[in-house]
């Protein structure tokens, strides 16, 4: 049971894309490399002086703005990512890597 506090710490980190560890790394001068898919080669994400951050949109309650720019038939993940980007949730990113795996994601990243 005493190990549960460690699980709660990691669970809390997942509540926001720009969490405590991301903020600390950016403040230390590291460059945040955003990526959307696990097909991105790991060697590109582990460059010296950089750290990787998977594009996520936890607690995204509405995709109204994203639906204005994309059809409502687009995957909810893509609309949530676009919604979070419009809200400024990825302003900490220094670069963005996109994989050719999803047509909707490719359109959003263009």
Where are these regions (language model features)?
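An N-terminal assembly and electron-transfer interface module characteristic of large anaerobic redox
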Residues: 1-110
């Amino acid at each position: 049971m005493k190990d549960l506090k460690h699980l709660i710490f990691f669970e809390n980190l997942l509540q926001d894309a720009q969490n405590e560890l991301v903020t600390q790394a950016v403040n230390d001068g590291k460059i945040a490399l955003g990526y959307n898919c696990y097909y991105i080669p790991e060697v590109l994400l582990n460059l010296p002086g950089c750290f990787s951050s998977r594009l996520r949109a936890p607690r995204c309650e509405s995709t109204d703005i994203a639906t204005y720019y994309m059809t409502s038939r687009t995957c909810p993940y893509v609309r949530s990512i676009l919604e979070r980007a419009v809200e400024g949730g990825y302003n900490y990113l220094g670069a963005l890597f996109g994989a050719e795996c999803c047509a909707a994601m490719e359109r959003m990243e263009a």
